[in-house]
Amino acid sequence: GDIDTVGDVNGLRAMNKRRKALMEELLITCPESEQAMVRSFSCFAADGDCIYLGNSMPVRYWNSFAQTSIPTENVRANRGANGIDGQISGFLGVSARCSRSWALVGDLTAMYDSNALALLPQLDRGTRVLGVINNGGGGIFRTLPGADGQPETMRKLLVQPHAHSFKAIAEQWGMRYLTIRTAEDFDQLDSLEENSQTLVELIPDREQTEQIRLRLANAQV
């Protein structure tokens, strides 16, 4: 039906402006958080002609924290039947028509479909960068309302912890491997070679990530 009023639009704009200012402040304060790493990754990915986002947190993070100064028009995403399945396959399919393609997926997503990298030799030449957020077993279910108040036995059911590195996966399929733990480590992305295949493992600081999440969740803006 008809809507009589939309409320105080100017107030909503002011609130959004304050929230964005808080987000920018937190990204500077917590440079090793997942959110800040996504921002930095997006700055480098902006020079690509296509970007592929894995399901779940990568899409949410990109929507909230990716850079917006350089428009990125060709952004693709896909949700498998179980969410995480087929994501790397989807990225490789999208990259087949791109000269410089970037992807950002979670660790469980990458492990689930890592064998898709066997397709690399079948693809045309091009620069491909696969970013993997390794936070030790996913983390979206930690952000659910009420999750913080659950007993430890219940919280263990919300994640799938692991201690795996993605270096061996990169080596298995002939990819260059880079590890990023700090903001300075992103400088490695300045030296990407043309027609190279690179796996970038992002290892964020959990405390900084949680600090940003809680500050934004409790912000009175």
Residue ranges of model-derived segments:
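Solvent-exposed, charged interface segments at domain starts and junctions
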Residues: 1-2, 47, 64, 119-123
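Glycine-rich, acidic loop regions that bind phosphate or pyrophosphate groups
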Residues: 1-15, 120, 145
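Acidic/proline-rich low-complexity IDRs
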Residues: 11, 21, 25, 36-37, ...
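Active-site diphosphate/adenylate-binding microenvironment
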Residues: 13-98
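Thiamine diphosphate
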Residues: 67-221
